[in-house]
Amino acid sequence: MIGMRVPSGLASLRTRAVVAQALLALFLLATLLVMLAALYMAWRELRSGYTLYLFTPPIFALFIALTLLPAAIGLSLWVWRGHANLAADHLTGLKYGALKATLAPWIPLANLALPKAAMRELWNRSHGEEEWFGQQSVDAINSWWTSYVIGMVILTLLTAMVLIDRFSNLAFLTPPGTNLLALAFSSGLLAASAWFLIRIISRITTAQETVTTVGDTFA
């Protein structure tokens, strides 16, 4: 987006985009590895007719979390710069400032909706839309957020179920292979969400560097 934004803000956004995309690529690789491993283990359980890997989901969930955390931090730094650039361009009607958009994923319950809305505004305003189109639907963001939320919900429920089964008097009886197939499905969704997000970061970063706002055009 060409306007009153300082070049240093655009350069910083590009640098942060590269870092965030690299960390997301590692997360994508980790989730794909988990998916493949879970599918193999599920196949073995289905063949044997027995549950062979009862405690595998929590271990894999921890592995995913360890790769998700640095990716989330890298994304937060990029989100901060992206929204700060919008403010520096003196755009009116922004609902999400840099601080609010950056903290949204880290606030319980709020992180179920606010990150998507903040990213949607960042996408639309970076692509030159006026404020009344700031929250219009974006297919890429819908795909990213749907994949991420469903994947995380399944992974969280699966991990909680296994831990409760292990450390309490409650027992969850599932057929062999069921938990691992659910793990593979959730990991696949998380991998897809990382792929969508890498592309979103690229599109928004390029838009801020090249797209001129309506206000700039008639200034």
What are these regions (language model features)?
Residues 1-51, 71-106, 110-154, 158-176, ...:
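Membrane-interface extramembranous regions at the lipid-water interface
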Residues 54-70:
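Interfacial helix-start motif at the membrane-water boundary
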